[in-house]
């Protein structure tokens, strides 16, 4: 199945503790159907020190993955969450917003 949400897309969270937050997609984990969104689902990870790489240990905050069904792409024209469709334009497959047919 084609990816409706890709890296660097602006998305809004639809469900969960961060509902309503907006952010940029940093990574898409296609095999697990999850995305990592900037500033969303921030967790504290206990990091061991690694002298070989020069990393000090401690508690690090980082974004955790959330399920792709809990995010929707943000339409910049309307400022709201929108659905994505696919169509062929000049022999190329393009993504478009279903609300106003604008190409992403």
Curated annotation (Swiss-Prot):
Gene Ontology terms describing biological process: translation
GO molecular function terms listed in the Swiss-Prot or TrEMBL record: rRNA binding; structural constituent of ribosome
Pfam families membership: KOW, ribosomal_L24
Keyword tRNA-binding recorded: no
Keywords from the UniProt entry: Ribonucleoprotein, Ribosomal protein, RNA-binding, rRNA-binding
Cellular-component GO terms for this entry: ribonucleoprotein complex; ribosome
Annotated gene: rplX
Function: One of two assembly initiator proteins, it binds directly to the 5'-end of the 23S rRNA, where it nucleates assembly of the 50S subunit.
Full protein name: Large ribosomal subunit protein uL24
Oligomer and partners: Part of the 50S ribosomal subunit.
Family, as annotated: Belongs to the universal ribosomal protein uL24 family.
């Amino acid at each position: 199945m084609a990816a409706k949400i890709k890296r660097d897309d602006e998305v809004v969270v639809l469900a969960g503790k961060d509902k309503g937050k907006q952010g940029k997609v940093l990574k898409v984990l296609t095999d697990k159907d999850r995305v990592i969104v900037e500033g969303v689902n921030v967790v504290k990870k206990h990091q061991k020190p690694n002298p070989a790489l020069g990393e000090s240990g401690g508690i690090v905050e980082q974004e955790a993955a959330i399920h792709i069904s809990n995010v929707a792409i943000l339409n910049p024209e309307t400022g709201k969450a929108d659905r994505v469709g696919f169509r062929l334009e000049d022999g190329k497959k393009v993504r478009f917003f279903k609300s106003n047919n604008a190409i992403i």
